[in-house]
Amino acid sequence: MQIDISTQLPCSLAEVIAQVRTPRLLHQVASPLLSFSPLTPVEFPGTWSEGTYWVKLKLFGVLPIGRQAIVITYPQMENAQTFMLRDNGYSPLITKWDHVITAQEVSGGTLYRDRVTIEAGILTPFVWLFARQFYAHRQRRWAALAANGFSY
């Protein structure tokens, strides 16, 4: 199942790129619905490099819901005014969590888009329902952070 949601952010493409590359931003936009704790490597880097990061997930910061692989790549874009980050993640229960973030410079700011493909067997509809709410929450948090100059 797929999710495709976008929002226009009141900031430059360069600001979005700088922020989306940081685990710190992930914590900000996911909170308080999900929290991520690094397993392997044992600490998050200052910025995401291409590679696999295993994390422990907690719902509302307290309820353990398992572990997840965050698999970061930065696909090349033909258009210099568009940025892409891909997390082709998975977990023991979710066989596919393919999250593609694109950011594109538009008049008045940056168009930010989350596209997610989820496969989790018979759990897929339930995981999709949660993910739909989660990504809407993330985009609201993104918009609030961008409006405040990313001071967090």
Predicted regions mapped to residue ranges:
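Short, surface-exposed coil-to-beta transition loops
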Residues: 2-4, 65-71, 95-100
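Glycine-rich portal/gate segments that line the openings of hydrophobic small-molecule binding cavities
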Residues: 38-88
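Beta-strand/loop substructures that line and gate deep hydrophobic ligand-binding cavities in soluble
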Residues: 82-132
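A non-catalytic, amphipathic alpha-helix used as a structural packing/dimerization or gating element
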Residues: 133-141
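Hydrophobic ligand-binding cavity/cleft-lining segments
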Residues: 1-49
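Charged phosphate-binding loop/patch that engages nucleotide di/tri-phosphates or the phosphate backbone
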Residues: 140-152
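Hydrophobic pocket/interface hotspot
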Residues: 16-20, 26, 85, 103, ...
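Solvent-exposed residues in well-ordered beta-strands and their adjoining turns
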Residues: 8-12, 56-60, 104-106, 117-119
